[in-house]
From Swiss-Prot:
Summary of subunit composition and partner proteins: Interacts with heparin with a high affinity.
Protein name: Lipase member I
Swiss-Prot/TrEMBL keywords: Cell membrane, Disulfide bond, Glycoprotein, Heparin-binding, Hydrolase, Lipid degradation, Lipid metabolism, Membrane, Secreted, Signal
Gene: LIPI
One GO location term (cellular component): extracellular space
One of the GO biological process terms: phosphatidic acid biosynthetic process
Enzyme class: hydrolase
GO molecular function: carboxylic ester hydrolase activity; heparin binding; phospholipase activity
Superkingdom to which the source organism belongs: Eukaryota
Signal sequence segment: 1-15
Disulfide bond annotation, renumbered to this chain: C238-C251, C275-C286, C289-C297, C436-C455
Known role: Hydrolyzes specifically phosphatidic acid (PA) to produce 2-acyl lysophosphatidic acid (LPA; a potent bioactive lipid mediator) and fatty acid. Does not hydrolyze other phospholipids, like phosphatidylserine (PS), phosphatidylcholine (PC) and phosphatidylethanolamine (PE) or triacylglycerol (TG).
Amino acid sequence: MRVYIFLCLMCWVRSDNKRPCLEFSQLSVKDSFRDLFIPRIETILMMYTRNNLNCAEPLFEQNNSLNVNFNTQKKTVWLIHGYRPVGSIPLWLQNFVRILLNEEDMNVIVVDWSRGATTFIYNRAVKNTRKVAVSLSVHIKNLLKHGASLDNFHFIGVSLGAHISGFVGKIFHGQLGRITGLDPAGPRFSRKPPYSRLDYTDAKFVDVIHSDSNGLGIQEPLGHIDFYPNGGNKQPGCPKSIFSGIQFIKCNHQRAVHLFMASLETNCNFISFPCRSYKDYKTSLCVDCDCFKEKSCPRLGYQAKLFKGVLKERMEGRPLRTTVFLDTSGTYPFCTYYFVLSIIVPDKTMMDGSFSFKLLNQLGMIEEPRLYEKNKPFYKLQEVKILAQFYNDFVNISSIGLTYFQSSNLQCSTCTYKIQSLMLKSLTYPERPPLCRYNIVLKDREEVFLNPNTCTPKNT
């Protein structure tokens, strides 16, 4: 009986000694009103590791000692939210932490600056971003004393949080390892000089995703590489009517967050294409990624770091910003799959029209892609590339259904049109061998099914 009582007491003592989880500030509209008269700002650092995935702990203890779960030798991701006009907790926050820790054994620090971001006065929140950055710099200097390295720090900032990340980077003279800006806030930052906003000089590598550049985000490129999914605004799947309520305002702005999370959680390769404009991208002018050498096209999201070396080379000498474009689907995980169809017509042929095509696989599945350009001229022996987007990945392709549409003013029901060579290549998975067919004869508006073969090296 005494042993039983002793064990019960031990269990009670252990449970009593367990520290409570650190909770994200739960504010409300009342706090936004209160801020009108009594402004407050506070920065709370919530630390997560694989040892405390579901229970945040303070980064520093009350005696200013470093939390024993923090590993100075591992990567540290700093996750910084943006403006919170009514004090709500970011719905994506906990899932983001989970996905990061599932990807890599790291330290994750959520920067809770809700008391400073929760206000009806947006300009006040903007001014608070610099104060938060100064506060963070104090904690970072303390971490450095414990043996942490700036090179291992990856700041992920959402909206105003992106500019906070930039201000922190400026304090440390651009020595942070990486900053990712997720739709950096545009109002009060657009067209400002680099010292007043996030800039590529703020870290050794800065990647930015623009998803609401005509609204709450910013249009101009800020990083070593700037991704513009769906042109950087009007994201598919987002409400188009103001009658949709708050989602109409924030859906596009938050899409950058969800795209980055999807890049971690799924097998999607968010292949993106370096281009001067979204218009040029849609006309298939930018399907080559030769400037990225063996790495192929850049990938949006967490894996953008793979292109750090090439991008930094492009920035040496004169700043050569890299703007890249891609399209996504409208539902999570937003995957799309790119193919390019390359066509060469014989030296005695000139065609002026358009193609449509569909793919068939060995299971009998058929899918027709979204094509980006309807009509274009096909000149003698000049390769013309047609960019195609599929919503499902297509492997084990058995047949290509091809249809040619001659321009309306040149239609000829008895004419034939020759193709010297056709090559289909996956851009999403460039390691897959391209498929080819040669010496093809077509008639206007008549579909032909072609059984392609793996291209020989001289034709690729």
